[in-house]
Swiss-Prot record:
SMART domains: Resolvase. NCBIfam families: excise, transpos_IS607. This is Uncharacterized protein MJ0014. InterPro entries: DNA-bd_dom_put_sf (IPR009061), HTH_17 (IPR041657), IS607_transposase-like (IPR041718), Recombinase/Transposase-rel (IPR051491), Resolv_N (IPR006119), Resolvase-like_N_sf (IPR036162), SinI_DNA-bd (IPR010093), Transpos_IS607 (IPR048046). It comes from Methanocaldococcus jannaschii (strain ATCC 43067 / DSM 2661 / JAL-1 / JCM 10045 / NBRC 100440) (Methanococcus jannaschii). One of its GO terms (biological process) is DNA recombination. It holds the Pfam family Resolvase. The lineage of its organism: Archaea, Methanobacteriati, Methanobacteriota, Methanomada group, Methanococci. Disulfide bonds: none annotated.
Amino acid sequence: MMIMERHYTLKEASKILGVSIKTLQRWDKAGKIKCIRTLGGKRRVPESEIKRILGIKDKEQRKIIGYARVSFNAQKDDLERQIQLIKSYAEENGWDIQILKDIGSGLNEKRKNYKKLLKMVMNRKVEKVIIAYPDRLTRFGFETLKEFFKSYGTEIVIINKKHKTPQEELVEDLITIVSHFAGKLYGMHSHKYKKLTKTVKEIVREEDAKEKE
């Protein structure tokens, strides 16, 4: 069965290539990019042309990214463990990887390297993203993000697929949400922020200990 090549609108192509629509129109007139025309006379850019311009000739030339994240500076040891786990996994599979890491909440979508990763994925420069756990990429909406990556030909590889209990997930989400909004309200380095997050964690630990008695 013949597979039809995908054709992008100028707006879609401009986002992927990081140039303006007018630039694409100039390239078309100058013969720098080969566009096709619809029956209505609209320009469309074949995927092969986008790949040619991006320098992506085939799947093997796309990067494999290892992404690691922790919420706080005090968790740098955990960050390093994630990185070593990802590197070991990649080595076992014979993959060359690039590591991207962030220190910040999983609710914060403005993380520097998270934004960089999204841009790389949208530019179709990433074949795989390796993570230690699903919540390292995002605290909520992981399945949606997974489908988003898939639409750009990027696979998410999860090393540790062990599922947490609903209670464990709820506790982690509660701590993350409180930490996130307390940081917004008081500032990440303020005394009020540290006191509030410490209190919440202590309450959670006490309740957990009671249930195990």
